[in-house]
Amino acid sequence: MEDAIYSFGTAHPGAITIKNFPDFLRNLTLPPDPATGIQQRLDLGAVDILRDRERGVPRYNEFRRQLRKEPVKDWNELAGGDVSLAKELETVYEGKLEDVDTMVGMFCEPLPEGFGFSDTAFRIFILMASRRLKSDRFFTTDYRKEIYTESGLEWVRRTGMKQIILRHHPGLEFAFQNVSNPFAPWCGRQ
């Protein structure tokens, strides 16, 4: 288990950006169908886009309008000034800027300074995270000593992710030297 956790902390997953969907997830080999024996391949990147379309997620420009953001006006703006990417997107979407899928558009957005994902994605993240926190009774009405105990609340107040990991996996202490934020990639030293 420590090896897996160490890998999560030191292996950089890559930026959440266009053309960075892991190749192995774009060409998954499924087990053979028991009835037919046929083995199929699956492109999870395409599945993500298809599911958004099936769920009725608006296309990128409409999504931006609904967030009160300006829609992109041309392919070059969408591609963040990358002329080659702009041409490729225009070809894929057959010149129809309004047809660009939301996920594709968000992956194309330039990242704000210090951000791990686009401004549009960040706005949705904030809305969803705050909604989940506000609707969880253990963070709201039941966040009290009668439920957690006073020592439990104290533990929550004083403990961070680094301490939680080390409490359960003390053998990883070497990996946390000079690590102030365990949610960022660790040093990777052994």
Regions found by a protein language model. Give the residues of each.
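Terminal regions of secretory-pathway proteins
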Residues: M1-Q190
